[in-house]
């Protein structure tokens, strides 16, 4: 029961994107503070399917490595599809085509380890967040081109800094979920990258973000009306 010495543990978050934040927090807990046996309930609003699989595998491995028996239960109100094998039914930005932009084509061609695979149109979506296929493709193309412009502003951009959002592969994570608290870096760069308060010589000053991002290191004033 709640509050009992042998009761379940609860982890609360808003959205599970890559699963790295929850996975890192709970991995550290497993190593340093978790009892030998426990049940953990993870509550979020929305889950992305690839992140769920990666996170649960990570937690399972950490539990085995620690020699403990911990059961994890993930609760959500919605699951959005973003696995590569189900890209035709993806519920994130996943381009079906690209414009004839030389820089974009070169960027795609340089990815050798995980070559980008285009989405085929006509896939069935459980949670259709797009008004139409035409509207979706327009959004994907414009965010792609804007993201490429932003990458060009950076002298040595991180490999994970992709046009459609931070990701280890593809053209970016492609999330369109923004909450009143923050804009995740899994969203297209055009939404959050840049800082109008940076010095003019800084590349960050060259792009005004639509939804300025608050990083973990920056204090958040919850009394501010956004």
Predicted regions: what they are:
Residues 2-5:
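A short acidic-Thr-Gly-centered motif at the start of a beta-strand
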Residues 27-226:
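PRPP-dependent phosphoribosyltransferase catalytic core
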Residues 8-10, 41:
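Structural motif
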Residues 12-21:
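Ser/Thr-glycine-rich phosphate-binding loops at phosphate-binding pockets of nucleotides
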């Amino acid at each position: 029961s709640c509050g009992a010495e042998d009761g379940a543990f609860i982890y609360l978050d808003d959205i599970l994107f890559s699963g790295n934040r929850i996975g890192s927090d709970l991995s550290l807990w497993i190593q340093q503070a978790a009892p030998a046996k426990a049940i953990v309930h993870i509550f979020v609003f929305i889950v992305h399917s690839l992140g769920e699989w990666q996170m649960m595998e990570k937690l399972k491995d950490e539990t085995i490595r620690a020699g403990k028996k911990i059961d994890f239960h993930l609760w959500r109100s919605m699951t959005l599809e973003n696995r590569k094998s189900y890209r035709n039914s993806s519920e994130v930005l996943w381009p079906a085509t690209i414009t004839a932009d030389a820089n974009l084509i070169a960027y795609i061609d340089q990815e050798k380890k995980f070559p980008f695979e285009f989405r085929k149109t006509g896939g069935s979506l459980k949670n259709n967040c797009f008004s139409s296929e035409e509207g979706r493709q327009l959004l994907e193309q414009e965010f792609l081109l804007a993201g490429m412009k932003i990458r060009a502003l950076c002298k040595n951009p991180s490999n994970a800094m992709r046009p459609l959002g931070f990701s280890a592969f593809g053209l970016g994570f492609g999330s369109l979920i923004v909450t009143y608290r923050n804009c995740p870096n899994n969203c297209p760069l055009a939404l959050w990258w840049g800082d109008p308060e940076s010095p003019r010589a800084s590349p960050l000053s060259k792009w005004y973000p639509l939804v300025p991002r608050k990083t973990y290191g920056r204090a958040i004033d919850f009394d501010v009306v956004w």
